[in-house]
């Protein structure tokens, strides 16, 4: 009798868990693999009673799925977020009840420059199709966005960020993918924030890549872990040490993107380890463009004081980094091409750009152009606390063009990064 009772209690507990998680599958997202010309990673979660652990995929023109292929995911029980203090959409404090099966699948052998659809499920039950596009086109474009701090009690934050992506889509209806520069959640330890965010349409339509922001790394009560962003995604496992799946690199076409985690670079030892890895990646992976991404700003937008620029500029000069992207400061800052601390004609040097916030809530106000580093900084932009902006990035063999757009699609700033490598 006791055994029967214990079994019933266990079944009830699992059923209650399944009821508290979203309907399976959840937190579905397409992520880059190391070479996005022929390989894409898919990440999702299912409750412990679900068998939706496969992904099927085919070219977007094959709407009947007649030529679909299927991949069984690698799975494990994920408890990363379970029991962490959080907030309900109604603003009530509770502990995340998030024990689920994490699924990761790599779709390989893909055709370059091709639109694909994919869905999650098993047997005859499959989710609605989602989309991604492989790289390989001579010309491509992306939406760059940052700092919308998803927080379910204040859904207008994500609404503003997603509306900004729609604005970029209107500016360029053929964008290929989305890159974020961190702080896309208020607390990365709140799995409910990730699952709600990834239900939004832009996560259905594009491959997403991104870096770990300080908010993505934290919990409501100031816990810290890089596992939060790692387990909400499936990034390439080509980083270093404990940063596998958090720090990573990938190709989109002939551009090499290198993704860093500022939270492990606060001390000199962590910075040295990250820089040794970046040097190795650049030396072993040739590309027309080298683009390094991190969350913390290169310069402080309100006064122009150097932040991360001084820690990285010598290495970027040495390695020939073309573009350095960041977020965090909530103020747009863009420099001239810089080499050896001085502006150049663009034939050498790195352009440093940090994105504005996009949640219509957490922007900053500045009165004048920065008083420091005026010889380096070429543009700043803000809308005060209610700032919303994003960047359209266009690439071809001759140059990268970055265009800052406001929420209405107006061009606020534009810069060109010349190709310096064949």
Describe the predicted segments one by one.
Residues 18-150, 394-422:
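Acidic, histidine-bearing metal-coordination/catalytic regions of metal-dependent phosphoesterases
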Residues 62-98, 142-162, 231-238, 266-270, ...:
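Acidic/histidine-rich helix-loop elements
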Residues 100, 125-181, 187:
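An acidic-aromatic substrate-binding cleft motif
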Residues 101, 106, 115-131, 192-279, ...:
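Extended active-site neighborhood of metal-dependent phosphoesterases/phosphodiesterases
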Residues 138-141, 173-178, 203-209, 245, ...:
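Loop/turn elements at helix/coil->beta-strand transitions in domains of secreted/extracellular proteins
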Residues 144-146, 177-183, 187, 208-214, ...:
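Active-site neighborhood of phospho(di)ester-bond hydrolases with catalytic His/Asp-centered motifs
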Residues 156, 264, 270, 285-324, ...:
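Active-site-proximal segments of metal-dependent phosphoesterases and phosphodiesterases across multiple
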Residues 158-220, 318:
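Core catalytic region of metal-dependent phosphoesterases/phosphodiesterases
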